[in-house]
Amino acid sequence: MQHTFIYDTCLWILSILIDFFFREVKTRGSFRVPRKGPLILVAAPHANQFVDPLILMLQLRREVGRRTSILVAAKSYRQRFIGLMSRAFGAIPVERAQDLAIRGEGKIFVVAEGDKTAIHGKDTLFTKHSVGDTLLLPNNYGSSHIASIKSDTLLYVKREFRGEDAERVLLSPEGSSYKVAPEIDQTYVYNEVRRRLVKGACIALFPEGGSHDRPEMLPLKAGVAIMALETLSQHPDCGLQLLPCGMNYFHPHRFRSRAVLEFGSPLSIPTEYVELYKAKKRREAIQGVLDMIYDALLSVTVQAPDYETLMVIQACRRLYKPAHIQFALPKVVDLNRKLIVGYNHFKHDPRVIRLHDKILLYNRQLYRLGLRDHQVQSLQYSRFMILYKLVYRCCKLFLLALGALPGAILFSPVFIAAHRISVKKAAAALKASSVKIQGRDILATWKLLVALGMTPILYSFYALLCCYYIYSYKLIPHSSIFVYTVPIISTFLFPMVTYAALRFGEVAVDIYKSIRPLFLALIPSKANAVYILKDERKQLVAEVTDLINKLGPELFPDFDPDRITTTIEKPERPSRFARRLSSSVASDVDNLSQLHDTDLNSEVSAPAPLQNVYLYSPNPSALPPSDEEEKDINDKAKLIRNALRQRMGQRMTEIRSRDTPPEEVFSESDEELSD
């Protein structure tokens, strides 16, 4: 990294946008990131076009202090603003075949009983293309390099197209459309990556090759494997490692959504793959490395075969989680992932199929009533209390709306412009892409870009307008010294008003979401449906819990339902000071975990005697250590617990000396994360 000051300054400026757009960004497993040495960080799924690399660089800088170089598409690198930021961050441009691909003439097909590498054409002009070009099937069904061209209607590819989708379109009577991308020389990219890695740099890339909004990962490109093998073949003692990173979002395109970055264990490429690569058996070596990376990414991402399955899995997680349990955000992601693994393994089991259909029906009933799952389980039948809560929350919502109104009006031009421009850009990207479903991976990027460009101009205009109004109408005498402070005050005042509106608005939105179920409970015709649905939910909870507890041990040997069902009960909704305490304690945990190289927010594969040691247990204890290593681990765990208890006791003393404010709703509950 040549210009560290420019890197840190630009990252700090853009971090303001990230903190403004996302309500919460968490990291899990950051202790696994090597602090020094060459590192290729492999991130997936690529669900937010330019936001993903920005969050990745920001969290790596905050958590482990490493500056990261990103591989960026040359098409984006040539854009004025994106190129400027990419150069400031030391990004490496990569020319992608799909950016240069052109639509081929006619249709292509293969003969069912013939050579699958022989591609036949109808009304095609294969001789216009060259050997080495890439033949691309639609919807990312597959690609292959052209080995030889025999005529305008016959060519051979280096390897046959594999996969059910590729075979279906190529064997269809009408044939398949296709694109042809020219051969690209990536020597510069490989040399530049190798040069930086040898110097101990951290290179991050997205091996899917582009952003998308699909619920599953796209096939990985071979570039990451070639970069790693090329570096190790020439510098075998450089100590290069690969690190998987899962980019997990809750509604990535929405304002004030949440994100979790999960880092897996570092991978070292086996020597046999490097030897195969040197021996010109590159296909075997590259495929072996890609399989390693793909398996590692599966352990840190949530992969669902389709959107409907993802919704069922998230509903299943809410039904399985006891109401008194409050999961941390990384734990929600981990439980979703394990449920998907279990579903894919047992999806043909009649019990799973029957439960799948029941949950789908339950979700549809929630949608028709306009309710969310956590609102059903928390509804209590007492008309007087329901009416009291409804009136109280409506009054509170009115006051909060008044507080948020000035800032909302000031910022409304940015909101309107960002929404319209992002929708247009998403539509254009969807039209040009063969892998996107709705183009949602573009929305957050363009919302942030529009806000970054418009906000300084808009608030400068407000400041000038304020100064003009005060000077023209002599609201402050021109002879007063305070007249010179007007530009400074107005420059800071309007952003502060907008930020206050943001905080008021968050609380107001949470209260607004809680009003509908209260209103429905007061209507006799709707109340019956709500309470019938509540009974159905109780039955679903019992069925889901029973089935997971039966099937879980078959797939996960260390599965223990008591670790969830016996967790301490969730306390009452925290006050402002209690939330501040929780945030401080979380910070202390992070600091202590770095000190002891232990991630307290992740599942640690400890020996069996240590699995009954809980950080916040009222009476922490451990079984007698069987050897010196376990004893050392127990000592470290006790040290961390004692430090946290002492810190928590000091802060609780401070809190008790203050007046506790009235109960307020400050954030969405865990149950709302995936609704």
Curated annotation (Swiss-Prot):
Write down which residues bear the modification named Phosphoserine: S669
| GO CC terms | endoplasmic reticulum; endoplasmic reticulum membrane
Per the annotation, which location comes first and is thus the protein's main one?
endoplasmic reticulum
E.C. number:
2.3.-.-
Transmembrane annotation, as ranges: 2-22, 397-417, 448-468, 481-501
Region annotation (Disordered) maps to: 616-635, 646-675
**Spans of biased composition, class Acidic residues?**
665-675
InterPro entries in alphabetical order: GPAT/DAPAT, Plipid/glycerol_acylTrfase
The entry's keywords: Acyltransferase, Endoplasmic reticulum, Membrane, Phosphoprotein, Transferase, Transmembrane, Transmembrane helix
Tell me one GO molecular function of this protein. Answer: glycerone-phosphate O-acyltransferase activity
Q: Where does this polypeptide localize?
A: Endoplasmic reticulum membrane
Q: How does the protein associate with the membrane?
A: Multi-pass membrane protein
**What Gene Ontology terms for biological process does this UniProt record contain?**
phospholipid biosynthetic process
On whether Iron is a keyword of this UniProt record, the answer is: no
Pfam families in alphabetical order: Acyltransferase
Family per record: Belongs to the 1-acyl-sn-glycerol-3-phosphate acyltransferase family.
Q: What is this protein called?
A: Uncharacterized acyltransferase C1718.04
Organism listed in the record? Schizosaccharomyces pombe (strain 972 / ATCC 24843) (Fission yeast)
